[in-house]
Amino acid sequence: MTLKTLFLSLGLFAIAACVPKRDLPPDQISKLTKLDEVMDVQATIADPQFKKIGEASYADADWAAFTDLGSRIQVTAAKAKDFSKGPEFDKLADQLGGKAKELSAAATAKDSGAASTALTEMKATCKECHSKFK
């Protein structure tokens, strides 16, 4: 390994280490004190699942992850309203929570189409909220 490669690797590692990762269970989410913390939890748990949008079928591990995501996003969506930026923000938080509930139902039924749709709609809701309030 050359010195240049070593420094590049260390630099990339340092950048990756600076990105907040919060993998909190629902009972800990309710204790968060900043909207940024809530958003970090959502990104940490949702982004890996969003990559599965459109897949024709899912494995048992995916269904478990979708169930977990659905329950935790319902909590983060409710918690986000504690830091409300107005009625439109609250509406989007409620919408996200509703889509998370749909994801949980799809996971219970092991309905691939409904799960993919719920994930797509959750991601779209996140993007809409970020475009208006971030």
Give a label for each model feature:
Residues 1-7:
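Bacterial N-terminal signal peptides that target proteins for export
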Residues 12:
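Residue-centric detector for conserved, function-critical "anchor" positions
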Residues 15-17:
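C-terminal motif of bacterial Sec signal peptides marking the signal peptidase cleavage site
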Residues 19-123:
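Extracytoplasmic c-type cytochrome modules immediately beyond a signal peptide or single-pass transmembrane anchor
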Residues 122-133:
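The canonical Cys-X-X-Cys-His
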